[in-house]
Amino acid sequence: MVDRRTLASLFRLAALSAAIPASLAGQTIALRTVPVATGDQFLVHPSRNLAMGSVSIALDDPWLDPFLNPALGSLLDESAFLASPTFYGIEGDNGAGRTVPLSGLFSGRRWFGGVAVALQQIVDENGSPAWIVRPGPWLDLRQPRRLDAADATNSYASGFLGLRLSARWSLGAGAAVAKLNAVDGVDLLYAGSQFIDQDGKIWDVRAGLVGDLGEERRLEAAVVHHRFSMNHDVGYLEWVWDPETMQGQVIERIEENLDRTSTTGLHLVFTAPVGERWRAGPTFTVNRKSHPKIPNYDLMNVPRDPGNSWAFNMGVGLGHQRGPLRFGVDVIYEPVWSETWAEAADTVRTTGGTLLQPGDRTVENDFFLSNLHLRLGIGRETERWGFQLGLGASSHETQLEQWNVVEAERREQDESWMEWTPSFGAVLKFPDAEVRYAGRMTTGTGRPSVDFAFREGTDRANDALAAADFLIAPSGPLILQEARVITHQLTVRLPLR
């Protein structure tokens, strides 16, 4: 049987990826250890290549690239205003989101820049039901659903500014902030909770450099620092027995949990011609992650679980652009090493008789993640219309080695899964406007849960609790109820001439 603490540790590492916006993932690497269906909450910037599998290494995305590496704004050929309403839903009423991003891109003779704002609604389809055993027919625990716990509003803002230093070199800097009242799926992380009030923020700063090395060879470099901070006020309804009145009572208990993660990263890309109208080159990314505080979710019986991670991203891209035809392929390998640990809150005696003091490590976890990503896309755009097709495939493998200091036990666990993301799009072009639709569907993820036959009766209502971005996994073998994620984005672009 899989150990409860082992699965809890796997989930803790999976939870760290929540702070990474998908649209900024070029320089920040998400850590994922379980195949949870994730919505596109952080898709808050327009993208020309979204329907082409989001290929990016050797095929430019002039709308998204400047927000990833601000110096790439030097490649803008004209100023434009863009509106990109985005909608996503997770199959099985597991959540949905609606976002309205507005962006402006400016290109001058020497200076260039851009700004983007977005307003978002996160919809909790299921709510957060309370699961409490009723001791008798006289106790009715049915509670009205809190409307303020169902939906939440988030706001985002980002911008960049750059300068063409010469005909070959450009420099840029950018920043992004977000005010969050919900991270999709967190409501289901706390088993048995009646309501969850979330409040937090994200801030991100980055700088970039782009250089033409001659003969159409290009070097791109970017550095980024990203911080995520959330507070969770979680309310529980608990049944207690009053010996004086000889009756049961329901009381409300509120817990405050903190979620903190910071990431510092370096991103490099080199591309060069490899034939007529073809480009290719390697990419390399390194992230140093610090996890000073991860929330104590309802299943987590070992609180105060800090950690550190080193994540790498290395790959190669191939791109082709000839007339109306565009084609791109990305192949990326991601190795990640992560260490987390639990610290004793009080004095603890090990099974061997050693006395651990407060602050000493009680559990040590060593993770190795091995991920492989393949993205390809093709599109054809004429002066009036166009289409795009894409496919993304990802292989995820996780190895965990856990040392329980208190019980002197060592455990190992391996997890693996595949994800598939087909995408498609259409383009209509007018003399003074462009309308672009992109849709994609992610399969291979869903709602992980524990096999009922192996569920422990001592667990507190933690069976099959899954969310859009996270998972609480109780003790026992895991099974997967697949839930597709479907995303639609409609972009309207108006050139500013």
Residue ranges of model-derived segments:
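N-terminal, post-signal peptide beta-strand-biased segments of exported outer-membrane/organellar beta-barrel
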Residues: 25-128, 149, 415, 440-443
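Residues on the lipid-exposed face of transmembrane beta-strands in outer-membrane beta-barrel proteins
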Residues: 52, 102-108, 157-163, 205-211, ...
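Transmembrane beta-strands of outer-membrane beta-barrel pores
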Residues: 56-58, 85-91, 117-123, 175-181, ...
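Residues that define the transmembrane beta-barrel architecture of outer-membrane proteins
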Residues: 64, 94-100, 151-157, 199-205, ...
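Outer-membrane beta-barrel translocator domains and adjoining extracellular loop/strand segments
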Residues: 94-97, 125-134, 178-195, 231-247, ...
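Transmembrane beta-barrel wall of Gram-negative outer-membrane proteins
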Residues: 95-233, 237, 250-253, 261-279
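Extracellular loop and loop/strand-boundary signature of outer-membrane beta-barrel proteins
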Residues: 142-147, 188-197, 244, 249-257, ...
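Outer-membrane beta-barrel "beta-signal"
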Residues: 426-433, 468-469, 474, 480-497
